[in-house]
């Protein structure tokens, strides 16, 4: 269900998600951005919820870059995931923000849920030549995210999924992150800005980054990266 959402009411939409069923979606269109909030309720354990932002970003990529079954918007090679969950464009540097993807989790009478919030830059859409009605684009993206989350939830309840939230999808996620193996600009609480290299990712979503002190593992909340 798509509902109109006032531009300033993202937090209210997240609170409202407590009582909403999976697939509830509210959206708003502004001059500079297009935003939507989607409720997902994957039947996974609490630890697996850590993987939701990554999986939501993969759902976005299914529409933007396409899959083996559908070409999507035909943007393969032009868009990618900026670890952990934002969507970027501007190949080959991939330094232009296309969409910010975040997930706020919670629990209510209906159980645990995730409120997926996506904020899309209109200027980036224009640069990519995307000419699609706002509501149709939101419907396509929300449906793809919901489908991705559903498939991931099934895999997360297998022995492979028990190893870590990204274990069932890590290889595919890896292929969607164009900055892996490349030098990036990194910002952390201890380093204002530095040129580091992203070497790999693990099944919990941590990035292995080669710094001046050697290779170190960082969770998403500890460091932010962008293309150079």
At which residue positions do the language-model features occur?
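Flexible, acidic active-site loops/lids enriched in D/E/S/T/G that coordinate Mg2+ and/or position polar
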Residues: 1-26
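A broad, low-specificity signal marking well-ordered, structured residues that form hydrophobic/aromatic
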Residues: 9-10, 25, 34, 207, ...
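Short beta-strand segments
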Residues: 11-13, 37, 82, 113-119
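DPxDG-like acidic metal-binding loop motif
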Residues: 22-43, 52-57
